[in-house]
């Protein structure tokens, strides 16, 4: 039968229309009355009856009535050629064949066996079909179909309806169960039908009518449970009469579906003919929608045949403002990005408006669904169910009352209510009224009370809770422990049947100790109330409730019950003992007057959900809702949201391989010194985590009767282990995984000690499993030497090993060796860091806590073995076992390993250079220094001359040279400037800028006499010109003290301008400039500036914009203070007298103010001696802090220090510490050098530098090949040399950097890279040097 024929027949079968069902009630009583009315209409001879009183006799009448029509079902039938004129007769024959193909089943016999599965005759199958139909639909759908079918005219269809009515009456009498959950939708070609169904439909042609498909036999899977018979049908979707029938067209439209959780929208086909919700793989990838495997794995037919093996999680979708939540099957190809099926629309009461091309949502008809009933065998305990008990004040149980002890009695809580909107006010009043009615709260006169707030419940209503956070600060903690989840799950091993109990309003089952009620007072707009039962929100409530329930359950808790708070799980190994176990627990609860929430209880199940896990006899997996919570998580916007996400992941970490590795990029964002910046790395990390949760592994229950295997391993930074047990199929299945960081001290352990540490930590982690084993369990390690250390009875090497050996005596185990290649799980775990486990403190060492590592791959091993053939000594060890034994060297996987677990390598080879480069430049430690790099490499490798080779490599590293500061003393001794012979011959000048504006000025011009130290202070502006400065200097200095012989100043543009040069020529003085970025050459002015600024702060710190008004006072104060260098005041040296500084003091005049007088000459001579002595003293102290000058020769490469305000300074803190390298042109003084700066910066900076600002650039051509990033080469200036290395031509080029155009650099690069940068220069060099390329 073709798919097209099937679709046609499907439409023809829907030839009936529904009646208007508005206002129809759907209780069982109304449904029975509805049946009675239909029967009265079609079988009037039965008469009316009261179905509430006489249902059984009514059904008997129906049975008797149908026995009067035996002729309808003859034992034989005649085959006829059918035409359109004989269609009804053909349909009747079809109905007859379905009942009596074997000729052994009468209508009455069929009625007496409703729903029972016996044999394989067609009647039984038809019965199963009706049972499936009955359980497939909810009540509303069922009524719609009954009312529609009861009004059709053709006889045989009416007969089918009449048959189904008494059958349905029986089902309503037997049970109250409706199945509203829609089964998975299958393609027609995959749907399994009976042979009769296929044979019959092959005879139909497209023009013919056929029977409604809901009355055709289908294959069913029937399972029996304790109370109900449930039938699940694998079927094609049931099309609704609202949308699709033979008189209506197939509706199709395309709407934009909004996915708010993923901030995207997709075009979605709305098609009443589509059999399932589908979405294309391309759409899933584009919007990163989470998916999971689909075990059904069917073929989806049609125009685009697809094999489906994945589906999305339930997604929140908005269509025309209507919100729904549904899943999609993922297909490779479809006509639209996504499609919504008819079933999804119907389930969400959504109608299609074909005229408006829109969707609308109808009001849902509520179904009356009763809570699950308590099984009959436990009816004696029905008085402890929530159905029979309303919430009331419980009786106090002595010794188990809730006690609230405070750290202090005299405390006050803040008095403030949270504002409540009208909706919450109503909820609050309802809660208060209910609490007062039941007696669990009462009005209070307490002086301290906490505010109330509201939290949403799962069903959408609000729960009033008290915010006890202010009170919790004063409550003494309860140290009663909550159980560990892992230990609870361990008790379940071996159990096959489970019952889960949930206590109703669990906290409210415990009375508050008399006298403590006022401590739990709360306030709201209605007043102040206090709890008489234990409330939610108090910090000590969980611990007290755990103590309470443990005490109530007593001894049963230890054998067959586990409980976590109000969740109680009863587990047993057989059905018979389980009944006894459940009754024991229910009796305990009854004795304590506790109430169970029947709606949340599950009895006699093979698998249950408990405290977030799906538990069965095989093991446990996380509940799907916890997985969906992570899968639906949006991108975190801040640290708080990221911590919440990682908290959800951490709950599931035991099911996620390599959790720490996956979350590493996310944890980096939580560090205090890391700025929040979301990158694709974090996005990918979240996607990787979600993919791991699509199908999490099953962890088995630990069973003490099974063999135990512990596999351990240690990496450089962590330890790992996997605990497994051997099952009946002789395979080991995991019980748990473990990994943990090492502490700083542990990082320095030897390899053997690290491997031993992995065993110790694993045994401590699973001590509750492994400490009491009768038979020895097996430990596998990939470190052969460890076996001897554990089994050796000689004295331990150190105290640590002695402690470990003492600890191992508590365990019954045997240890075996297995190569690391076979121990891949534990090996991988040891390279994962469990970031939730605290790192143990250890005072033995404080060295670095992270070590790089090189992967020992097969290629690496082959390379080492190849290098061994070139080293005579190592080759001898490789081939001579006796020699290896003599030198305590092992041969492992082709590698020579010494007693320190170091791999022996030939000295100074390409391999050793590669190792150094990987650890220095490509590892997780960023360019470690010589000592650190040496220590790291020595942990895994050793060769002759290793320290020297590492030192040479690090010293020649370009990145280290330009970015790392130097720790040596500065170069160059101090060269003091000789003092002048008299005042105002030699001056120094500078500007103090960045002053607040005062009277129009914002800078200060400072002139200092180098002999007397006298200062002249002149207010000015920062925008002062050279001409204005010259005029000011003429009026304030030359006019009073005459022409100077020399002036020392910095390289300010004013003093280097042509205007100032003309001014100096006019007054015949020489300009001398201090070295750039060398304040010591003009230290006098710098020191004077500091003193002036200090004096200004003293006089105008409160009113800084008045500093101009105080300049004369500051100048007078400075010039009349005794200077440490001259031992006299500047004013006295210049003017030869001391002025009066207060009204109580008279000025002192000298009799000889003539500068040529003997006294004046003597004073000047004394000042000069003091200045010389001061210079010698300064030089002595300065030179103690410097080291010998490093002599540079012309042509040497040097780097220039980037000072805070100097050469090529960048405000960016991450800018390199040095610029360059530059070539030395010549030496221009005792301590100064002239450098070859690029033309682009020559006009900006002086090319002369003091030696203290220079560092030699080290460059070993044998070590540094292709050190330049090709994107950094701008313009090649010239090529210095070339080398052939491993059949590759390298060029040493001098170039202008692309990244920093102001810098000329040099380095090695490949020929190809150089040609891309400047083809002409490279070709000229090749031609001039006769290179064969």
UniProtKB/Swiss-Prot annotation:
Chain ranges passing through the membrane: none
Residues covered by the Reverse transcriptase domain: 436-615
Gene Ontology MF term list: aspartic-type endopeptidase activity; DNA binding; DNA-directed DNA polymerase activity; endonuclease activity; metal ion binding; RNA binding; RNA-directed DNA polymerase activity
Post-translational modification comment from the UniProt entry: Processing of the polyproteins proceeds by an ordered pathway, called maturation. It involves the initial cleavage of a 27 kDa capsid protein (CA) from the N-terminus of the polyprotein, followed by the cleavage of a 56 kDa integrase (IN) from the C-terminus. This leaves a 72 kDa protease-reverse transcriptase fusion protein (PR-RT), which does not seem to be processed further.
Entry keyword set: Aspartyl protease, DNA integration, DNA recombination, DNA-binding, DNA-directed DNA polymerase, Endonuclease, Hydrolase, Magnesium, Metal-binding, Multifunctional enzyme, Nuclease, Nucleotidyltransferase, Protease, RNA-binding, RNA-directed DNA polymerase, Transferase, Transposable element
Ligand binding (Mg(2+) 1): 502, 566-567
Binding annotation for Mg(2+) 2: 990, 1050
Organism domain of life: Eukaryota
Residues covered by the Integrase catalytic domain: 979-1138
Alphabetized Pfam families for the sequence: Integrase_H2C2 (PF17921), Peptidase_A2_2 (PF12382), RT_RNaseH_2 (PF17919), rve (PF00665), RVT_1 (PF00078), SH3_Tf2-1 (PF24626), Tf2-1_C (PF24614)
Domain Peptidase A2, first and last residues per copy: 266-342
InterPro entries named among the record's database cross-references: Aspartic_peptidase_AS (IPR001969), DNA/RNA_pol_sf (IPR043502), Integrase_cat-core (IPR001584), Integrase_H2C2 (IPR041588), Peptidase_aspartic_dom_sf (IPR021109), Retrovirus_Pol_polyprotein (IPR050951), Rev_trsase/Diguanyl_cyclase (IPR043128), RNaseH-like_sf (IPR012337)
Active-site residues (renumbered): 271 (for protease activity)
GO cellular component terms given for this protein: nucleus
Biological process terms in GO annotation: DNA integration; DNA recombination; proteolysis
Something else known: Retrotransposons are mobile genetic entities that are able to replicate via an RNA intermediate and a reverse transcription step. In contrast to retroviruses, retrotransposons are non-infectious, lack an envelope and remain intracellular. Tf2 retrotransposons belong to the gypsy-like elements (metaviridae).
Name of the featured protein: Transposon Tf2-11 polyprotein
Organism: Schizosaccharomyces pombe (strain 972 / ATCC 24843) (Fission yeast)
Lineage: Eukaryota, Fungi, Dikarya, Ascomycota, Taphrinomycotina
